[in-house]
């Protein structure tokens, strides 16, 4: 924790400096590689961690080494992870998917924005200083056409996005030759289908079945295709966004870039303060990962924060505004029904979802059914025209472990399953949001209920937190639950930062939350038996046993922290080649002792073998050549 707290002015200046001086940056001893596909423009980025050779013998003067293979890993950092790419936040990222979108011939450019709010913002000269300078003319599906990845998948079409994803999900493991690295324990997948090699056809089939989604708005061509589904790698979402009391556009762009650097597969912009529209434009134009939002937050701002004044018209305008900016998925709290609200009365913590509480208040004040539920088909029509995926929000999720798995929570979940089928009628991609606060013994039921009642649509959970006693450490309490539910089949985990329940996270909090959740997701992949998931672990274990300290740092999820902790006690360069660390010292290092035992055992075996052969030679009379029948 920093000893001195920066002022708001200093925070903004620091963020501005960050984005002004931003360059493509690789992690230590890593390089960006690209694997090309068969379709035009399919060039999939990965990070390759270079390793040092292993000393296997020889003398001090002429040591003998064995090379260690470079380890390819999944990379979410986009152009920010490639030192060869010039970064200019003012111009935004290259439009990777634009040629693919144009080639399909099913979209048209809009001459006029569909949202009245967008028109008003564009006409306001006072916003010129804040507005993103680049111009993206939004697109929409042509009349009678659907432009969703689900629609294409159901038509049997393998899109470039699907091939891109297949290559990405395989993580370059076909490049690994070492049997030591390829070894993997069998997993327990709880019914998940995990093929040894992920093909573009497998991706298409999973999307067509609704078991996976590709969040890829046609107006966010900068994004690199990724997939969310239980038969793929477990993904992690990071939340950013300003509030009425803190954060600025510069800081949110900084947090976006920072999130992708530390492994965010998607980012949700949960801004509730000023300049939501302008902040989101900057984020989208500079994001290589899908961006999600909760549209009800902005709709509420449009009616001055008064939930009772919300209308379908204001909400619809917000959907159009955000869809034409390029938002890839909407969280919609359409399952908070009027009849479910009384079920929360006996809860210890009531309704803790912001979106859920807004809709519950609206329902009670008007004594009408949730207008998101009533207009759900119209929501689907909008999403189908831009390929916005739906993340059906759990507005009645439990906010304490006492309220876990109650009547209200599962009533809403069953309604989300009904809405899923409606969305699929419009070829709209769907995932389901889940809790929340759930003790460990009650977590698996959440997954089984979701699979049964939501027809295997991908599950996306916030944690869940497994205990309520650790404010300041809720990235730990929730990381435990996240690892478990990821193993049981959850497709994406929404990170929790140390600031959960306490305040708006800063840059360091974002990193802490992401590292915690990348650990949880990876642990789940190992437990499920995802092919190739253990390669990096094996490489780390080999480097650890061989005292290749630099390789240990570089293979870590956070190389900088690993190195810093090591160097606190052994900062000298000699510490990087020492066969011990400060934990045990040179005489008590178990791995050093194990190496000595192994070397001793191997030597003794050889010597014993020579002695046995010598005795056998003498017993046979010392003859160099034996008759055939004696041999």
Swiss-Prot record:
Binding-site residues for substrate, renumbered to this chain: 239, 268, 297, 333, 353-355, 394-397, 433, 460
Keywords: 4Fe-4S, Iron, Iron-sulfur, Lyase, Metal-binding, S-adenosyl-L-methionine, Thiamine biosynthesis, Zinc
Catalytic activity: 5-amino-1-(5-phospho-beta-D-ribosyl)imidazole + S-adenosyl-L-methionine = 4-amino-2-methyl-5-(phosphooxymethyl)pyrimidine + CO + 5'-deoxyadenosine + formate + L-methionine + 3 H(+)
Enzyme class: lyase
Biological processes, Gene Ontology terms: thiamine biosynthetic process; thiamine diphosphate biosynthetic process
Family matches, as Gene3D superfamilies: 6.10.250.620, Radical SAM ThiC family, central domain (3.20.20.540)
Binding-site residues for [4Fe-4S] cluster, renumbered to this chain: 581, 584, 589
Gene Ontology cellular-component terms listed: cytosol
Pathway connected to this protein: Cofactor biosynthesis; thiamine diphosphate biosynthesis
Listed cofactors: [4Fe-4S] cluster
Annotated residues for binding of Zn(2+): 437, 501
Co-factor note (free text): Binds 1 [4Fe-4S] cluster per subunit. The cluster is coordinated with 3 cysteines and an exchangeable S-adenosyl-L-methionine.
Gene Ontology molecular function: any one: zinc ion binding
The EC number(s) this enzyme carries: 4.1.99.17
Membrane spanning stretches: none
HAMAP family xrefs: ThiC
Role summary: Catalyzes the synthesis of the hydroxymethylpyrimidine phosphate (HMP-P) moiety of thiamine from aminoimidazole ribotide (AIR) in a radical S-adenosyl-L-methionine (SAM)-dependent reaction.
Family assignment from sequence similarity: Belongs to the ThiC family.
Self-association and partners: Homodimer.
The name this protein goes by in its record: Phosphomethylpyrimidine synthase
Organism: Escherichia coli O157:H7
């Amino acid at each position: 924790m920093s000893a001195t707290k920066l002022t708001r002015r200093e925070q903004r200046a620091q963020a501005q400096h960050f984005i002004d001086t931003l360059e493509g940056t690789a992690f230590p001893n890593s390089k960006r590689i690209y694997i090309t596909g068969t379709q035009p423009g399919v060039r999939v980025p990965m990070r390759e961690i270079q390793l040092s050779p292993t000393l296997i013998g020889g003398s001090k003067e002429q040591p003998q080494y064995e090379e260690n293979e470079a380890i390819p890993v999944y990379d979410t950092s986009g152009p920010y992870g490639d030192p060869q790419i010039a970064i200019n936040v003012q111009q935004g990222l290259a439009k990777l998917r634009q040629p693919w979108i144009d080639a399909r011939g099913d979209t048209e450019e809009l001459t006029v924005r569909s949202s009245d709010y967008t028109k008003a913002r564009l006409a306001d000269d006072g916003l010129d200083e804040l507005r993103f300078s680049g111009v993206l003319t939004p697109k929409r599906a042509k009349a009678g056409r659907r432009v969703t990845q689900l629609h294409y998948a159901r038509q049997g079409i393998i899109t470039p996005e699907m091939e891109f994803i297949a290559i990405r999900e395989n993580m370059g493991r076909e490049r690994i030759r070492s049997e030591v690295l390829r070894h993997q324990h069998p997993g327990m997948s709880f019914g998940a289908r995990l093929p040894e090699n992920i093909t573009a056809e497998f991706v298409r089939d999973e999307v067509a079945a609704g078991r996976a989604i590709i969040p890829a708005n046609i107006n966010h061509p900068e994004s690199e295709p990724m997939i969310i589904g239980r038969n793929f790698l477990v993904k992690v979402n990071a939340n950013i966004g300003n509030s009425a009391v803190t954060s600025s556009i510069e800081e949110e762009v900084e947090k976006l870039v920072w999130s992708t650097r530390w492994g965010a597969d998607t980012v949700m912009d949960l801004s509730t303060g000023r300049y939501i529209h302008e902040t989101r434009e900057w984020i989208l134009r500079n994001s290589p990962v899908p961006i999600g939002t909760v549209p009800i937050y902005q709709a509420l701002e449009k009616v001055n924060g008064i939930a009772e004044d919300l209308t379908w018209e204001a909400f619809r305008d917000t959907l159009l505004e955000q869809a034409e900016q390029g938002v890839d998925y909407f969280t919609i709290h359409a399952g908070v029904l009027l009849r479910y609200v009384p079920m929360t009365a006996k809860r210890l913590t009531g309704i803790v979802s912001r979106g859920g509480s807004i809709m519950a208040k609206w329902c009670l004040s008007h004594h009408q059914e949730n207008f998101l539920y009533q207009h759900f088909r119209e929501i689907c029509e909008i999403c189908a025209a831009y390929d916005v995926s739906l993340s059906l929000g759990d507005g009645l999720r439990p906010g304490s472990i006492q309220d876990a798995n109650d009547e209200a929570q599962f009533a809403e979940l069953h309604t989300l399953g009904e809405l899923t089928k409606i969305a699929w009628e419009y070829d709209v991609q769907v995932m389901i949001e889940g809790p929340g606060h759930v003790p460990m013994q009650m977590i698996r039921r959440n997954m089984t209920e979701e699979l049964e009642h939501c027809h295997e649509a991908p599950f996306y959970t916030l944690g869940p937190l497994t205990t309520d006693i650790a404010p300041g450490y809720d990235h730990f309490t929730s990381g435990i639950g996240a690892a478990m539910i990821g193993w049981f089949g959850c497709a994406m985990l929404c990170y929790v930062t140390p600031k959960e329940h306490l305040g708006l996270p800063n840059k360091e909090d974002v990193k802490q939350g992401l590292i915690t959740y990348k650990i949880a997701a990876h642990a789940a992949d190992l437990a499920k038996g995802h092919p190739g998931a253990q390669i990096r672990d094996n490489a780390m274990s080999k480097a650890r046993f061989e005292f290749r300290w630099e390789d240990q740092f570089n293979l870590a999820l956070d190389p900088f922290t690993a190195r810093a902790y090591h160097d606190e006690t052994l900062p000298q360069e000699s510490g990087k080649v020492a066969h011990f660390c400060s934990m045990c010292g040179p005489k008590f290092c178990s791995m050093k002792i194990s190496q000595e035992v192994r070397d001793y055992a191997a030597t003794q075996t050889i010597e014993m073998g020579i002695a046995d052969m010598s005795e056998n030679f003498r017993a046979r009379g010392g003859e160099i050549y034996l008759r055939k029948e004696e041999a």
